[in-house]
Amino acid sequence: MVKNVFKKLGKKQKNNKGFSLVELIVVIAIMAVLVGVLAPQLIKYVEKSREATDIQNCDSIATTLKTYYSDKEGAPDTIKVTVSKDVDPVIDPTTQTPLKDTGLETTRLKGTKWDGNIDITYTSATGKITYSASSDYYTATGTDDQIKPKN
């Protein structure tokens, strides 16, 4: 009886099927090469995505300012919002309401390629928005221009 059990165990061990250590090392090496080649490209696209999100947030802030102050009596003549990487948007505390209403009061720049801040200035007399921003990917200066990708 005991001999039969050992014979069965011995047969099972001889019929083991699986990957050898060499095969596993080859697969890991191939995966490491693929990651090394593809990672820089992926990082570049992630950075562009962050900057595009920053631009969309700034456009939302500009639209919010236009909408809020188009109907507001006694609004200041000029409202300037500065969006940066390190601090929440800097504006006059009396004009903070439109950003709080839309949840944009804590918007910060997430892209790493911005040269500085994005300044958004709304002039109520003309109803125009002026952007001032610069990065490796995007630039804008002018009235009612969107922040556009560099060519």
Per-region residue spans from a language model:
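Aliphatic-rich helix starts adjacent to a transmembrane/signal segment
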Residues: 44-60
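Short, surface-exposed interaction loops/tails
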Residues: 84, 88-90, 105-151
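Conserved alpha-helical elements of the SDR catalytic core
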Residues: 38, 45, 65
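N-terminal leader/signal peptides at the extreme start of proteins
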Residues: 1-19
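Alpha-helix exit/C-cap motif
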Residues: 63-83
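N-terminal single-pass transmembrane signal-anchor helix
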Residues: 16-42
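Contiguous, function-dense segments enriched for cysteine-driven chemistry
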Residues: 25-28, 70, 85, 96, ...
